[in-house]
């Protein structure tokens, strides 16, 4: 799909919603909250199957300190588990190596060099 096709499809959806009487913003927000809660519950269930108890505890600690990084780790774990490239359950030691790899990949992108030019 190209961008123009997506725009046309979105425009048609909006026109259909207006013709049917669009739901009010509270209903939309409530529906989004329900979807988000269902998504989080499903993700938690998958993490329970994938990770050992110690690894889950480590992930919850990371989630408190760096929620964005924890989200990235969870997505990576789910993808690896679905592709069958992950030993289930993931031990804490294996989880540490995965975290180290993910962290070094992420920090390599963000690393900046500051140079002082003196005259």
UniProtKB/Swiss-Prot annotation:
Keywords: DNA-binding. Residues 1-36 are annotated as: Disordered. Residues 15-32 have a biased composition (Low complexity). One of its GO terms (cellular component) is cytosol. It holds the Pfam family dsDNA_bind. GO terms for molecular function: DNA binding. Residues 1-11 have a biased composition (Basic and acidic residues). InterPro entries: DNA_bind_arc, PDCD5-like, PDCD5-like_sf. Belongs to the PDCD5 family. This is DNA-binding protein Maeo_0998.
